[in-house]
Amino acid sequence: MDDVHVSSYANLVLLNKTYSSMESKRWNRARRAFLNEQRKKGSLQCFYCYKSELKINTSGRADQATVDHYIPKSGGGDKFSSSNFVVCCHSCNQRKGNMTPQEFLDSDYIKKKRS
């Protein structure tokens, strides 16, 4: 009986890893497509602080263009829909976290960055 539970648990872990990997690949494709589309439009500017001339593929740098979920996933925002994406600098994306756009725009952090 215990072997059945162990086997079932192992299968669930494997299934979860497979699903997570597929979801990660889907997110990376959506993110890259959105950023490339925005770059072609000439709009790689942070939606929140207005920092311009952001770059793609500069991981972790202040000038890195990232994709933020306008309506946070935790608040029911669509994870893969470009209609829920905005271009955002790395700093703002890290700071915003699960805040709503209005909460973040009203924060002292953004007020200081914009001034």
Would you name each region that the model predicts?
Residues 85-107:
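Short Cys/His-centered divalent metal-binding micro-motifs
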Residues 2-4:
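Mixed-charge, low-complexity interaction segments
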Residues 49-55, 91-95:
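Cys/His-rich metal-chelating microdomains
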Residues 52-85:
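Histidine-centered nuclease catalytic patch
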